[in-house]
């Protein structure tokens, strides 16, 4: 105890052991709470037990390989590593960004924001990858067989962009079933598309209704089989009906075959 300048008595706490102990106790409690929080965040006793990868096109194994994340990895290695994995895929042309979340049960959840592949376009006997915005790759690359090739479209045209949007809106099973998309306008249908399917059928549709109408495709194929038609035309422009190939359809397909043979012969000649 001491006297103030006004003659009043004051209590000094700087050397008071009781107050010092209380301050030390609260400091220790805060540090211990932070330690526990860090411990439960890193979970050094736990491993990654399961991985879940959400993609639109990419195979989940591709993503895990690029990130180098595996079941059995220590939990702490991946805790709070969202920015780290994004640095790993910074120059990857297929991925825009990744998000990583770890659940308390040891599940690593990865969500992928992809640069989608809409298909491939041939220019001067070289193939180029086309993304969801109709932008072409700077380097030539062979089609992957998982997305269609686009024929007779003008680069960057509205009809091309609408077609890409419609194609990417289709169910995954149906997207994989399409081998080629042709811009095939006729007087009665100026926006007509012709889709060459992997099963040998030809589909006519419009970009505005393509994604919705393609859901009818399996039923229409079944109808064709009931009629004894192995391969034919499924017209989805104004409803949905199936028929046999006609001369106009054969001419369309034969012209495509002719173009392919010409381009292949040119490329073989240029390589000699």
UniProtKB/Swiss-Prot annotation:
PROSITE patterns in the cross-refs: POTRA
Cytoplasmic side: 1-21
Transmembrane segments: 22-42
Pfam families xref list: FtsQ_DivIB_C
Annotated localization: Cell membrane
Keyword Transcription set for record: no
Residue stretches making up the POTRA domain: 43-115
Superkingdom of origin organism: Bacteria
PANTHER family noted in UniProt: CELL DIVISION PROTEIN DIVIB, CELL DIVISION PROTEIN FTSQ
Protein name: Cell division protein DivIB
Organism: Oenococcus oeni (strain ATCC BAA-331 / PSU-1)
Gene that this sequence comes from: divIB
